[in-house]
Amino acid sequence: MSLTTPDKAQVLADALPWLTALNGKIVVVKYGGNAMTDDRLKAAFAADMVFLRNCGIHPVVVHGGGPQISAMLKKLGIAGDFKGGFRVTTPEVLEVARMVLFGQVGRELVNLINAYGPYAVGITGEDAHLFTAVRRTVMVDGVATDIGLVGDVERVNTDAVLDLIDAGRIPVVSTIAPDTAGLVYNINADTAAAALAEALGAEKLLMLTDVEGLYTDWPDRGSLVNQINSDALAELLPTLEEGMVPKIEACLRAIDGGVPSAHVIDGRVEHCVLVELFTNEGAGTKVVRS
């Protein structure tokens, strides 16, 4: 059922408190999942970023590219594997990831946003020393496990991103970054988004997923929560499914780093970012400091 004109006006008026609270603030959005594979959702996400920008909010997009990387690896006949929720990255896999993230996924999103005007600029963690990486391991069945050329973010230099924001642009960040010796790593986009949100002093970190939010007792659909504090979330972490772990670790990192709230939202919902930021119902789970 379509809204009447007064109803549409009321929707806009109802959003005013949130628009006021976020005016001039930075919101880091991790773009991934179905939202980056479905054409309708991709277009809606791009429109959401432009909406935020034109309302005086500063969106910064950090994107993944898991499905696209997997598809390219398959096309090239290169084996792929995951451990602890992270992609095992050999030198061959890294070259594919580098090509796909910046040359395909990032370019597509930049073009979708720029259909509305000269807003988006794509950069990588390699540009202007944005990210300095350090090699990481992951815990698999309680054992620290090497996963190849996969890095964590050791340092963030926000100068380039802040320059883009000051120029009225929307940074679109691909998460490939070198260490201090110049060896390049693939950084999980969830991890990178949290580190960037912390370094920028962002007001919010939004994580797009393919679920309705956080379930405290999956697969019990009744265990979906709309808000949880960081202590309760940390206790829940060992029970979560492997694919959700990097996202929840990222939320906790952001909260511990001073970001007021992190949000795990359903990227399958059209305009999910606007729904989460500007409605009472939201589109997922809000994480706050204990």
UniProtKB/Swiss-Prot annotation:
EC number: 2.7.2.8
Keyword rRNA processing on entry: no
Residues annotated for substrate binding in this entry: G65, G66, R87, N186
Pathway(s) per entry: Amino-acid biosynthesis; L-arginine biosynthesis; N(2)-acetyl-L-ornithine from L-glutamate: step 2/4
One record GO biological process: arginine biosynthetic process via ornithine
CDD domains given in the database record: AAK_NAGK-C (cd04250)
Catalytic activity: N-acetyl-L-glutamate + ATP = N-acetyl-L-glutamyl 5-phosphate + ADP
Example of a GO cellular component annotation carried by this entry: cytoplasm
An annotated Gene Ontology molecular function: acetylglutamate kinase activity
Compartment list: Cytoplasm
Function: Catalyzes the ATP-dependent phosphorylation of N-acetyl-L-glutamate.
Family statement drawn from the similarity comment of this UniProt entry: Belongs to the acetylglutamate kinase family. ArgB subfamily.
Listed name of the protein: Acetylglutamate kinase
Organism: Mycolicibacterium gilvum (strain PYR-GCK)
Protein's gene: argB
